[in-house]
Swiss-Prot record:
S-adenosyl-L-methionine binds at residues 73, 94, 122-123. Methyltransferase required for the conversion of demethylmenaquinol (DMKH2) to menaquinol (MKH2) and the conversion of 2-polyprenyl-6-methoxy-1,4-benzoquinol (DDMQH2) to 2-polyprenyl-3-methyl-6-methoxy-1,4-benzoquinol (DMQH2). PANTHER family: 2-METHOXY-6-POLYPRENYL-1,4-BENZOQUINOL METHYLASE, MITOCHONDRIAL (PTHR43591:SF24), METHYLTRANSFERASE (PTHR43591). It comes from the Bacteria. It catalyses: a 2-demethylmenaquinol + S-adenosyl-L-methionine = a menaquinol + S-adenosyl-L-homocysteine + H(+); a 2-methoxy-6-(all-trans-polyprenyl)benzene-1,4-diol + S-adenosyl-L-methionine = a 5-methoxy-2-methyl-3-(all-trans-polyprenyl)benzene-1,4-diol + S-adenosyl-L-homocysteine + H(+). The gene is ubiE. This is Ubiquinone/menaquinone biosynthesis C-methyltransferase UbiE. It comes from Coxiella burnetii (strain CbuK_Q154). The keyword Transferase applies. Its EC number is 2.1.1.163, 2.1.1.201.
Length: 250
């Protein structure tokens, strides 16, 4: 899709570009309270390993300033916080206030707050100075952004030279037998889980459809290059169900 067009996808629907952000907002307002529980159920807990792997790819050090973009409920930030220490800083930015509220309460309950900030922000127009962060990590958030290229360009602007972005996102299975099983699981079981646990089948149907509409591994790699990231690469996890992309700013 040409991201300058006046329409875009919302799951499998085609909607005016200026309406997608609000539609995604309503989805995450609906699922915020049960989001982490549903992640456990939908991935059978494997999302925890995916996130741990993504954090290892960040190569974090004490004193660094990290942007956890689309960080919502703080599941990545709680892993990052002890690695950068009290001398470091973790900024959790998310466009959705409901997700931030869940994350704020959860991290406070866990005693994780000394080096954490919460900021409501649009990934396409990040409200930070140029060359501000040592690393940016975005987990399962990029596919919900209306203009992904604009978001990647915004990330490139605010990251320091020598820093890099790590993108953890659902992708395309690389094994044909896995794809058939994955499709059946996604379209038959996950919306029903959403209805049973979160009382919201339609929002979880959108989340499944948004995964299918997200660029595959090579297409996202190309988009990162278009945003001026260099030395871009990726690792497939769980047979390509998830991929971790990384791109540098020099």
């Amino acid at each position: 899709m040409n991201e300058t067009e006046k329409s875009t996808h919302f799951g499998y629907q085609t909607v005016p570009t200026d309406q997608k952000t609000d539609k995604v907002k309503h989805v995450f307002e609906s699922v915020a309270a049960k989001y982490d529980l549903m992640n456990d159920l939908m991935s059978l807990g494997i999302h925890r390993w995916w996130k741990d792997f993504a954090i290892t790819q960040c190569r974090l050090r004490t004193g660094q300033r990290i942007l956890d973009l689309a960080g919502g409920t703080g599941d990545l930030a709680k892993r990052i916080s002890p690695l950068v220490g009290d001398e470091g800083e973790v900024v959790i930015a998310d466009i959705n206030a409901a997700m931030l509220n869940v994350g704020r309460r959860r991290l406070l309950d866990q005693g994780i707050f000394r080096n954490i900030q919460f900021i409501q922000a649009d990934a396409e127009k990040l409200p930070f100075p140029n060359n501000f962060f040592d690393r940016i990590v975005i987990g399962f958030g990029l596919r919900n952004v209306t203009n992904q290229l604009a978001a990647l360009q915004s990330m490139h602007r605010v990251i320091k030279p020598g820093g890099f972005v790590v993108i953890l996102e659902f992708s395309k299975p690389t094994l044909a037998p896995l794809k058939a099983v994955y499709d059946a699981y996604s379209f038959q079981l996950l919306p029903r889980l959403g209805k049973l646990v979160a009382k919201d089948e339609e929002s979880y149907r959108y989340l499944v459809e948004s995964i299918r509409m997200h660029p595959d591994q090579e297409a996202l790699l190309s988009k990162m290059t278009d945003a001026r990231f260099e030395d871009c690469d990726y690792h497939n996890l769980s047979g390509g169900i998830v991929a971790v992309h990384r791109g540098y700013k020099f």
